[in-house]
UniProtKB/Swiss-Prot annotation:
Protein name: Transcription factor MYB65
Recorded name of the encoding gene: MYB65
Disruption phenotype: Reduced expression levels of aleurone-related genes (e.g. CP1, CP, GASA1, BXL1 and BXL2) in seeds. The triple mutant myb33 myb65 myb101 has a male sterility and exhibits slower protein storage vacuoles (PSVs) vacuolation rate in aleurone layers upon seed germination. The myb33 myb65 double mutant is defective in anther development, with a tapetum undergoing hypertrophy at the pollen mother cell stage, resulting in premeiotic abortion of pollen development and male sterility. This sterility is conditional, fertility being increased both under higher light or lower temperature conditions.
Function statement: Transcriptional activator of alpha-amylase expression that binds to 5'-CAACTGTC-3' motif in target gene promoter. In vegetative tissues, inhibits growth by reducing cell proliferation. Promotes the expression of aleurone-related genes (e.g. CP1, CP, GASA1, BXL1 and BXL2) in seeds. Together with MYB33 and MYB101, promotes the programmed cell death (PCD) the vacuolation of protein storage vacuoles (PSVs) in the aleurone layers during seed germination. Together with MYB33, facilitates anther and tapetum development.
Annotated region described as Disordered, given as residue ranges: 1-44
Amino acid sequence: MSYTTATADSDDGMHSSIHNESPAPDSISNGCRSRGKRSVLKKGPWTSTEDGILIDYVKKHGEGNWNAVQKHTSLARCGKSCRLRWANHLRPNLKKGAFSQEEEQLIVEMHAKMGNKWAQMAEHLPGRTDNEIKNYWNTRIKRRQRAGLPLYPPEIYVDDLHWSEEYTKSNIIRVDRRRRHQDFLQLGNSKDNVLFDDLNFAASLLPAASDLSDLVACNMLGTGASSSRYESYMPPILPSPKQIWESGSRFPMCSSNIKHEFQSPEHFQNTAVQKNPRSCSISPCDVDHHPYENQHSSHMMMVPDSHTVTYGMHPTSKPLFGAVKLELPSFQYSETSAFDQWKTTPSPPHSDLLDSVDAYIQSPPPSQVEESDCFSSCDTGLLDMLLHEAKIKTSAKHSLLMSSPQKSFSSTTCTTNVTQNVPRGSENLIKSGEYEDSQKYLGRSEITSPSQLSAGGFSSAFAGNVVKTEELDQVWEPKRVDITRPDVLLASSWLDQGCYGIVSDTSSMSDALALLGGDDIGNSYVTVGSSSGQAPRGVGSYGWTNMPPVWSL
C-alpha cells in the first residue's frame, strides 16, 4: 500500500496530512449523504479523477454554486469541499512556491494594520491563498523569535506605534467620558446630601474676626505677624504684605493694645466709601473717626511714617518728624468748605522740615486747583509722589523770592478772619513786617484766641511776648511716643523739648486749633487756670487733659 501527501478538506480549512490513498472501509457509511438520492458523500483526500471532474464542471458552468456540482456530475463531494479544492489547488492563476520580497513586505505592513485578517490580505495578493499567507506568518514568527529579532522593521514599528497610541488615547477618552457620565448619573440619583468637607477645611484655616484685627494691627506696625498662613486669605481691602513696614524699630514702644485703635475687618467690608471726587485725603494719625473729622475726610486709617494706604488714601512722600500742627492738610478739602477762602502763602526757607510741613500740611490749595493737580496719580508708584513733592517745594521757594514784603499773618492761621478783626492801628504793624518777624511760626510765639482778637485787644495781647530762639543744629529724638492718643504729635512730651523751633507751650497749639475749628469748636473750650505759680501765658490757654469729649478719647 502506498502513501502520498495530499490535501484534505475540512470545515476548519485546508491542511496537509499523510493518509492512505485508498478510502477507508467505513468512509462511505460515515460520509455525507445527498438529499435526493440519499447517497453517502465522500470525505478525505481528493483523487486525480475527482480533480478532473471538478475542472470540467468549472469550465462549463463557471465558478459559483458549488452545491450544484453533485447534481450535474457523478462527484460525491459536498459544495464546501469543491470550493476549497478549486481555490487552493485547481484554479489556473494560483501561484505556487515561496513568497517574493515584495509580497513579504506587503504581508508585514498589512499585518501591522489589520492583524490576523488572512482573507482580506489574500485579496491584495493575487494568486495567493489565505492559508498560504497564514502559514508564512506563523513560520516568520518562530524564525525571528529564535534569532532574537523584532517582529516588525523599525520604520513599520514606529508607524504602528503612533497608530496604537492614537487608538489607545481615543479609547481612554471614550472610557473616561463613560465613567464621568456614570458618576454624574450616580450623583444625580443619590438621595444623600452632598457635604463639602473641603470648604470646612478652608474655613478652619481662616482666622477669626478678632484674630484678623490683631493681625492687621501687628502687620501695620511691622511686628512680623504676617505669616504665610494668612497671606493667601487676607481680604483684598486690607493692605498687602508688601506695603507693611520693613521693621518695627520706628515705634518700638508700641504695645499690643494698639489693636483697640484700629478698625475691625468687618468695618472695612461693610462700610461704604464716601469720598469727595475732588479730594485726596491724608491724615497723620487718623485711627479714631470723630464727627468733626468725618465732615472733611472719608473713613480711613493710616499710620505715620508709612506708605500703607487703605480706602484710597495716598501716602505722604516724606516722613514727618517732630511736632505736626493739627490742621486740615492741603490734600483734604471740599468745594463748599470754608477753606476755599484761604490764600496760599509761602513759608520762609527755615528748614527742609518746615518746608515739607508747610507744603503738605499747612498750606491750603489755591482756588484754581484742578482735579488733576490734587495728586491725580493716586494709584501710581513712588516716583510720582517724589516729583509732586519736588514741584511743591520748588514753587514755594520761587514764590518766596518773588513775593512782596507784605505777607500774611502766618501759614497756619486764617488770614481772612484775622484781618477782619484787627483794629486799624494794628494793620500798620502787620504791613510793616515787624509783627511777622516775631510771629513767623507757632514755635516762635503764642497766638491768642479769636475772641480776644475780635474784642480789640490785638496789640495788647502781643505786647509782652518774648520771642523764643532755639539753635537749629540741635538734634533731638522723642523718647516716648504714645501712639494710642490722637494728639500724639501735639502732646507736651513732644513740645517741651523745643526742637526745631517748635513752640514749647501747649496753649499756643490749642489756640491754633481753636482758630482752625471755627466758632463752634472754639466756644466749646473751657478756660483752665494754670496749676503752677506762674501767670497764665494767654487768655486762650487750655489744658490737653481737660479737653472736651470731641477731642479726647
